[in-house]
Amino acid sequence: MKFCPECGAPVELRVPQDDHRERHICTVCTTIHYHNPKLIVGAIPEWEDGRILLCRRAIEPRHGLWTLPAGFMENGETTAEAAARETLEEANARVAIGDLYSMHNLPHIDQVHLLFRAKLLDLDFSPGVESLEVALFTENEIPWDTLAFRPVKFTLQHYFEDRKKGSFHFFNVDLKPPVDKPDNHA
């Protein structure tokens, strides 16, 4: 950031009084501009027969790989609204959003991923502009080796374990940077 979005004056990077981190501070109006983690919000859309809806990505990062419908939360929406919107945008699928199921903290890329359980309302779905294809998968059919992001893989593994136990439990994971695949964005 070079200029203040409030007044247009230059900003400088320094530690504000009574703070402990560098922040962008306007040199004229003294507004402190905080850069906080981005929220990635999505759904685990399940059809009544237990299959899960996945999207094959048409965009980078991880073009051509499979994922749950998810994306950046927008201002002015709740996390549940964001999960439903992303499912509609990426898979043209309508869902009833349920409970928050997983949270993954990824401090190395300044992101927090939130995934909700969701019920597909019908089988009228198709690829959105960010998806090459969308499909329903049983646990055994999921393309585990071509899942785009670690939070998606961990969430699906946990989801199927919980489903076998007959009860679902929220889980929270702090993910460190991957050491084996530096191109893995999460």
Regions found by a protein language model. Name each.
Residues 21, 36-40, 47, 61-63, ...:
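Short connector loops at helix/strand junctions that flank enzyme active sites
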Residues 1-43:
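Acidic, metal-coordinating catalytic segment for phosphate/diphosphate chemistry
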Residues 45-46, 54, 118, 136:
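Conserved hydrophobic "DFG−1" position in protein kinase catalytic cores
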Residues 46-89:
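Conserved Nudix-box catalytic region and its N-terminal flanking loop in Nudix hydrolases
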Residues 73-96, 100-158, 162, 167-168, ...:
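Unchanged
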Residues 172-178:
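Short, highly charged C-terminal tails/helix-capping segments
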Residues 5, 12, 27, 53, ...:
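Nucleotide phosphate-binding site architecture
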Residues 42, 51, 133:
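Conserved beta-strand and immediately adjacent loop positions that scaffold enzyme active sites
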